A protein has these predicted regions:
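Membrane-water interface at transmembrane helix exits
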Residues: 58-62, 88-96, 134, 182-187
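Interfacial segments of alpha-helical transmembrane regions
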Residues: 62-84
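Membrane-helix interface segments
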Residues: 36, 68-72, 138-142
Length: 219
């Protein structure tokens, strides 16, 4: 391992069983870098967790304003994220692919990751969120903002040496397709949630606080 400034340059065994296009794509993105882009990539990644928590805020706001559509959109988005990340982490430990910085020479490593590489949970979760929101609210500015954000998250994972391009592509597909399927079967899925998960949230204007009632999973 070689420390270069704020980055880590890992030396690993030169041989790898990964497809050549995957390795070449990773190297091209990872090694075409600059300090300013490093900073942007780091900042962009820090938005992932708060953005993934967005459905909670949307649901609470929908409860406060009695906006049923917003609450439904929040439930669909949260469901897409949960199903996507569950599937992704199951795949990670079935495939058990090593992170590129652990098995390739000369990969710049920005950040850290302990779980297996394939597929990318960041890309999957980001596109589950972005796709779900754009399907529920198909306004141009929402589509552009959400998809640019998700693309930045996905690209950044390769740039930072955390993933091969195929990790990100498959993660993107899993996240986007899960959100699309849930949107396509929206009515059935929301009925399923209402039947199996007794959750009621009301907003009391006088006390200016949220009251959570009957938060009981009834599976």
């Amino acid at each position: 391992m070689i420390v270069t400034g704020s980055n880590l340059l890992y030396l690993a065994p030169a041989s790898t069983a990964q497809p050549q296009w995957d390795v070449q794509g990773l190297r091209w993105i990872n090694q075409n870098h600059s300090p300013s882009v490093d900073d942007v990539a780091h900042y962009w990644e820090t938005t992932a967790t708060p953005m993934m928590a967005m459905p909670i805020g949307l649901y609470l706001w929908g409860a406060k304003t009695n906006d049923a559509k917003l609450k439904d959109a929040a439930l669909l988005t949260a469901s897409a994220e949960f199903i996507t990340l569950s599937a992704v982490y199951l795949l990670k430990y079935i495939v058990n692919r090593q992170r590129p910085f652990r098995e390739l020479n000369g990969i710049r490593k920005l950040g850290d990751a302990k779980s297996p590489s394939f597929p990318s949970a960041h890309a999957a979760g980001a596109f589950a969120l972005a796709t779900s929101l754009t399907l529920e609210y198909p306004k141009t500015w929402i589509r552009v903002t959400a998809l640019l954000w998700a693309t930045g998250i996905a690209y950044g994972r390769i740039y930072q040496g955390m993933h091969y391009p195929s990790d990100v592509l498959v993660g993107t597909f899993v996240g986007a397709s899960t959100a699309w399927i849930l949107h396509h079967y929206k009515k059935s899925w929301l009925n399923f949630l209402q039947h199996h998960l007794s959750l009621q949230i009301t907003w009391t204007q006088n006390e200016q606080r949220l009251i959570f009632l009957q938060q009981l999973p009834l599976f």
